[in-house]
């Protein structure tokens, strides 16, 4: 399946955010996977419109009004995230020693 240039653009913007802005914020994401990892997976697994809806919905949860926790992209399993080298934000009960 060919990735559209719009998806590639959004993926690039997410990576740019991860490399530039995210380190300056300092506080960890309240979710697993992190919001940026969630967005990358959503763009990979779903059509663009569905991905953007899922990403917007997730970002609207990001704040003190939501407890956070494990929130996976629909159609994925936690194993897919634990195997991903992109996300270092592993929930405490899933850490390996």
Swiss-Prot record:
GO terms for cellular component: plasma membrane. The keyword Nucleus does not apply. It is a peripheral membrane protein. It is found in: Cell inner membrane. The keyword Membrane applies. Keywords: Cell inner membrane, Cell membrane, Membrane. It comes from the Bacteria. Its main location: membrane. InterPro entries: Membr_insert_effic_factor_YidD. Belongs to the UPF0161 family. HAMAP family: UPF0161_YidD. Could be involved in insertion of integral membrane proteins into the membrane. PANTHER family: MEMBRANE PROTEIN INSERTION EFFICIENCY FACTOR-RELATED. This is Putative membrane protein insertion efficiency factor. The lineage of its organism: Bacteria, Pseudomonadati, Chlamydiota, Chlamydiia, Chlamydiales.
């Amino acid at each position: 399946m060919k990735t559209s240039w719009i998806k590639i653009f959004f993926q690039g913007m997410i990576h740019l955010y991860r490399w530039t802005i995210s380190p300056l914020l300092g506080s960890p994401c309240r979710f697993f996977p992190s919001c940026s990892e969630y967005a990358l997976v959503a763009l990979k697994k779903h059509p663009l419109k569905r991905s953007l809806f899922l990403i917007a919905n997730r970002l609207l949860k990001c704040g003190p009004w939501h407890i956070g926790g494990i929130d996976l992209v629909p159609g994925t399993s936690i194993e897919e995230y634990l195997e991903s080298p992109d996300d270092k934000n592993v929930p405490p009960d899933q850490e390996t020693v």
